[in-house]
Amino acid sequence: DESQYAQMVAEVFQTKHHSHTVQTSAYDLIDKLVGLYDEPYADSSAIPTYRVCEMARKHVTVALSGDAGDECFIGYRRYNLFAMEERIRRLFPETLRRRVFTPLGRYYPKLDWAPRFIRGKTTFQALARESADAYLHGVSICSDEMKKSLFSKKQTSSLQGYNSRQVFDNHLAGKEFEDPLRMIQYLDYKTYLPGDILTKVDRASMGVSLEV
C-alpha cells in the first residue's frame, strides 16, 4: 500500500490528490479485461491499472503516463543485479565460469524464505551463462528445465525446435553494444515495453475512453 507515500508526494508538489481504495476481490473485472486485451495477457497489474484509469476518467479525458521511466533511466533493481553479475563475469574466463557456477547453480538450494544476501541460486545460474542468455533466464518465470518437465513429447515436437531465447536473438542480430547494460535496456525496449507495459496501459485506458 503506497497511498501514504503518494499523499506525501502530492503535498510536496501541491497537486490535487485523489485516493480510492478498492476491494482485493476484483475477480468480476477479469472477464472484462479479457475482452479489452483480446489476447493472452498475464500481468496482474492490469487490474489496478484499469481501476486507476477508471478513476482518472472521472476528472480528465487525457493523462500523461510515467511508464518507460525505469527502462530509460535504469530504475529496475534487476539492472543493478545484472551490472554486478557482469562485473563478476569479466573476472573469469568463460570455461572457468561454466565449470564453477553451473554446479553451484544446480545444487545450491532455492531459499526464497531466506534473507536476500544468502539467496544465490539464480545468480549462480546466471553467472554460468553469457550476458543475454543470463538476462533472459533472470526475467523468465519458466526455466528451460521446467518447460521440459511440463511439455509432453507431442508438445515439444510441435515447437519444432523453437525456444523463447530466439526472440532475444532476433532483436540482437547484427547489433553491437559497448555496454552490456545498454543491451538489456534495448531488449526491454523491444520486448517488455511493447509486449507488456505499454500494452497494459493502452488497453486499460482505452477501455474507459481515457487518452494516455
Predicted region positions:
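A short, charged helix-loop
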Residues: 162-173
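ATP-dependent adenylate-handling active sites, centered on carboxylate activation for C-N bond formation
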Residues: 1-162, 200-212
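Structural motif
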Residues: 42, 175-188
